[in-house]
Amino acid sequence: LYRFHQWWYAERDHDHNGICEYGSTDGTLIAAAWESGMDNGVRFDDTRMLKNEMEKAWSMDQENICLNSFLYVDKLTLSEMASILGKQELSEQLAKEAEVIKLYVQTKMYDSESGFFYDIRLNDRTPVKVMGAEGWLPLWAGIATPEQAESVKNIMMDEKHFNSYLPLGTLDVSHPALRPTFGYWRGPVWFNQVYFGITGLKRYGYVEEADLLTRKFMAHAQGLMTDGPIHENYNPLTGEVLNAPNFGWSSALILRLLLDQ
């Protein structure tokens, strides 16, 4: 597990600053976007690829807020595992590295003007100002300061941004690139991002808001309150089912949402 974790820093940290980027082995942007899991996300529309030092290693030219939130949690988890195994030096090293990510995200990847977290460009550290579901990952991870979490919460609860008919879509519903029907990661609602968002709100004490969004999601996603199949994603404006039925992580995460109530 530790070797896999370290792979990111060997293959996907273009400037060796301890903050990673999604990338690919063949230098193509589409493969790098696939690596993110958010295949056609709007934040990647103007992204370019950079060759890294390792053979067959390329990075996007932007540091990714979701990836580094995941890596922060990885470091804390691995630190705890190392401590249990008696590897105290490694445990302390990982904990220190996690703090580096936390401070960087708080100070570099949060935009105080808009009150949201974003990917940032490598060349000038400016934010890629596309409000997407990745922006609440620092709440799920426990990285955000209380003030930052409150600002992100306000945006999540705003009907002009993410509190749409079916809430917590993958793109701000006021964004001109929104494609609510068959847009895949350009607006539709995915269960995993809903789960991250609701869990993040609860982590910072916004239980009432989290419960409101959970109830709204369950009531408005087509078929969830009947015997309809659970789908891959949903239209944020209508709740209409989209793409593959009987989708695995969607089904699993409904249970998590309900059990966490």
Locate predicted features.
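A generic structural signal for well-ordered alpha-helical surface patches
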Residues: 195, 199, 211, 215-219, ...
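Extended, well-ordered alpha-helical scaffold segments
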Residues: 1-8, 74, 78, 85-105, ...
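Amphipathic alpha-helical coiled-coil segments and their boundaries
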Residues: 60, 64-67, 87
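Amphipathic alpha-helix face/heptad-repeat signature
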Residues: 67-70, 94
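Peripheral, non-catalytic segments that deliver or gate enzyme domains
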Residues: 64, 182-206
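Extended glycan-interaction surfaces of carbohydrate-active proteins
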Residues: 14-63, 100-189, 222-261
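Well-ordered alpha-helical scaffold segments within catalytic/enzyme domains
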Residues: 7, 69-88, 137-148, 195-207, ...
